[in-house]
């Protein structure tokens, strides 16, 4: 947790972020889908269905369903691992990278680091 932000402030940022995502005309992701997406994009290294299931402590079918939705939205894609054809790799996409940039912007705004902060300073 950031040293200068209380738990209440962080929950407020989360709420504002979720509300902004709900209001916008963009991908509508469940909490699990968002968790899988963020794990793939924020943790370095190759990701597999098996590894994501272990990291998130959910079943492989749950990861597969989340990846089905992320794939429909072109936020992630799956590819058979050429080194081990039993394993499926999860890959990032340009659209997923753009979504992550947007998400970071929304969170910056919600935390007061964006236009809101500039408006408050000008007032």
Task: Map each language-model feature to its residues.
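N-terminal helix-turn-helix DNA-binding core of bacterial DNA-binding proteins
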Residues: 19-58
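Basic, amphipathic "hinge/linker" alpha-helix immediately C-terminal to the N-terminal HTH DNA-binding motif
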Residues: 82-103
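N-terminal leader segment of winged-helix/HTH proteins
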Residues: 1-27, 123
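Generic structural signal for well-ordered, non-membrane alpha-helices
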Residues: 16, 35-38, 65-71
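Canonical helix-turn-helix DNA-binding module
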Residues: 46-88
